[in-house]
Curated annotation (Swiss-Prot):
It holds the Pfam family YgbB. SUPFAM superfamilies: IpsF-like. Binds 1 divalent metal cation per subunit. A divalent metal cation binds at D12, H14, H46. Keywords: Isoprene biosynthesis, Lyase, Metal-binding. This is 2-C-methyl-D-erythritol 2,4-cyclodiphosphate synthase. Disulfide bonds: none annotated.
Length: 162
């Protein structure tokens, strides 16, 4: 079937640990803890990357940028996102819009959302009006509510490239 649109969803979660910078959506946020991971552990950009790759039928971030590969140690997730977008476009698809939710008890995401939107739009090659970021707490429940980690969920729409 030759469908004109595809939808992908992405999810990622990382533990908060001392001694690392907190980078979300390509923005360094002042905080006492950062996210643990092989790369820069940008939970939002990892979920965006998964959503785009999934919508294009190209698997997930782990297939393209495995955490077992030393080449990706400390990698900038914006570089990974741009590479994933190039793969999506090479497969004949173009990003249309991205809707994301960052799940974090702390820090507050809202003051940084505009910069995150600008980064994601630039890296995906779409207008910033086509990127939306929401922030939610976990109301003190579970590991997110206990400030042990931060998660992100993303939905992305692709259109067949002309």
């Amino acid at each position: 079937m030759n469908v004109p649109f595809r939808v992908g969803q992405g999810y990622d979660v990382h533990a908060l640990v001392a001694g690392r910078p907190l980078i979300i959506g390509g923005v360094t946020i002042p905080h006492t803890h950062g996210l643990q991971g092989h790369s820069d552990a940008d939970v939002l950009l990892h979920a965006v990357t998964d959503a785009l790759l999934g919508a294009a039928g190209l698997g997930d971030i782990g297939r393209h940028f495995p955490d077992t590969d030393p080449a990706y140690r400390g990698a900038d997730s914006r570089v990974l996102l741009r590479d994933a977008v190039a793969k999506v476009r090479a497969a004949g698809w173009a990003p249309v819009n991205i809707d994301a939710t960052v799940h974090a008890q702390a820090p507050k995401i809202g003051p940084h959302a505009g910069a995150m939107v600008a980064n994601i739009a630039a890296d995906a090659g779409i207008d910033s009006a086509s990127v939306n970021i929401k922030a939610k707490t976990n109301e003190g429940l579970g590991y997110l509510g206990r400030k042990e980690g931060i998660a992100a969920t993303v939905v992305a729409l692709l259109a067949r490239a002309s």
